A protein has these predicted regions:
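Nucleotide-activated chemistry modules centered on ATP-dependent adenylation/adenylyltransferase
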Residues: 1-213, 218-220
């Protein structure tokens, strides 16, 4: 048998998306005692035993970036130099100037400061040329992605067969039906039944079979 994790009792607080990369060795030594409780029940239990965090408001930010300025955090805690660059369209035409690629993500519309007469969105980020590609909303949708750095949980390996799963491409994504198949030793192709918005390179894609985590990888 294999160790696996399943979704929590409260979908809004489910953390399986962030835990897909746990190994079998780690899972064998892991207990998750609050997975069957709602957040309200945990607060009630905390209050009963006098924990001061019982009424602490939920955090809406990255827990280790208190001012939510993640771009500044990256610059201060890495060797990355964040330079200004160009907004371009898919043909390479320059549309304006951006303040550094760490300030943007695929699918973003707000904060671009581009007056083009119609709504535009980030469709791609090109770190090798320091360009942020801008396009229409439909350009953000795709019915296919590939991923690498795979970790399998409920199964030992995908092998040569295809598998029907539900895939989440971000924490807040509700999941979408798709077919996955291996296209290399450490690569998987994921083909969705319906196009999905803003599958972003560097983010995790996590595969589910019902409530159980099958595995996942890093979107290319």
């Amino acid at each position: 048998g294999r160790y696996a994790i399943c979704k929590s009792a409260t979908a809004a607080k489910d953390q399986t998306y962030a835990l897909y990369n746990l190994t079998q060795h780690q899972l064998a030594h892991t207990l998750m005692p609050v997975g069957e409780y709602t957040k309200d029940k945990i607060r009630e239990m905390a209050e009963e035993i006098g924990l001061p965090v019982a009424h602490k408001p939920d955090s809406q930010e990255i827990c280790f970036v208190p001012d939510n300025d993640y771009a500044k955090f990256i610059e201060e805690n890495s060797n990355c130099r964040i330079d200004e660059g160009n907004f371009v369209d898919k043909y390479g035409n320059i549309l304006g100037h951006h303040k550094g690629i760490t300030h943007y993500t695929v699918g973003q519309r707000k904060g671009l400061n581009l007056a083009l007469g119609h709504p535009v969105f980030v469709t791609e980020i090109r770190p090798e040329t320091n360009e942020v590609v801008i396009g229409e909303n439909e350009d953000v949708f795709s019915n296919r992605l590939t991923c690498r750095n795979l970790n399998w949980m409920a199964i030992e390996d995908l092998g040569a067969q295809e598998m029907r799963v539900s895939a989440k491409i971000r924490y807040s994504h509700k999941g979408a039906s798709c077919t996955i198949r291996k296209i290399g030793e450490d690569r998987v192709e994921c083909v969705f039944d319906e196009p999905q918005r803003a599958a972003t390179p560097g983010q995790a894609v996590v595969f589910y079979d019902g409530e159980y985590v099958v595995g996942g990888g890093t979107i290319e």
